[in-house]
Amino acid sequence: MTHVRPVEIFHLGPIPIYSTVVNTWIIMILLLAGIFLATRKLSFIPRGAQHVLEMFLEFFYGLLEEIIGKEGRRYLPLVATLFIFILSLNLSWFIPGMKPPTMDLSTTAAFAVTTIILVQIFGIRKLGLRGYIRHFFQPAPFLFPLNVIEELVKPVSLSLRLFGNLFGEEMVVTILFLMIPFLLPTPIMLLGVLMGTIQAFVFTLLTITYIANFVHGH
């Protein structure tokens, strides 16, 4: 079983750089290269990777429109990037010797904190500063402390959910291999892909609902 604690690789001055960070950099480079190759020859009639990419974007555009409304399209870059990046990190165990960075709590916490900060910025831009503050007094003024606490707890909930589910998945897979050593690896790999996809989608869907909460002003 993989250790939860990341391995220290090197230092940038006094700052230690851990395996989680290096693995994340590798995935980012691979993603950028893949997107460049998929979009370098765009055509009016999409084919191959371009077709898959457009179908993916259309799916999330439809989801945003369904939950937020017509103005949901402006949040498509954030939502699509979140899903692709988290999914790629979740499935990075396909690369020999690489541990998924999302199995490190610091990675999931960084995703969660960044996402919630962006949601607050979207809320202020949509409602204005007064409307943003007033939002915390809804539906009744005495709920202000609870609404503030709820907002502060969101990054904790997001980060622990993603980390815990992925760590639990690894535990289940390890136990299955120990109990049934002759089990074919293909079903286990498919289970890992399914779980990684579900967790990336859940994180993205929660982000959309948080944005919708501010956009709709309730």
From Swiss-Prot:
UniProt subunit comment: F-type ATPases have 2 components, CF(1) - the catalytic core - and CF(0) - the membrane proton channel. CF(1) has five subunits: alpha(3), beta(3), gamma(1), delta(1), epsilon(1). CF(0) has three main subunits: a(1), b(2) and c(9-12). The alpha and beta chains form an alternating ring which encloses part of the gamma chain. CF(1) is attached to CF(0) by a central stalk formed by the gamma and epsilon chains, while a peripheral stalk is formed by the delta and b chains.
- Subcellular localization, as worded in the UniProt entry: Cell membrane
| Identification of the protein by name | ATP synthase subunit a
The record describes its membrane topology as:
Multi-pass membrane protein
**Gene Ontology terms: cellular component:** plasma membrane; proton-transporting ATP synthase complex
Q: Where is the signal peptide?
A: none
Q: What is its main location?
A: membrane
HAMAP family referenced in this protein's UniProt entry, alphabetically: ATP_synth_a_bact
Q: What lineage does the source organism belong to?
A: Bacteria, Bacillati, Bacillota, Clostridia, Moorellales
Q: List residues traversing the bilayer.
A: 17-37, 75-95, 104-124, 162-184, 196-216
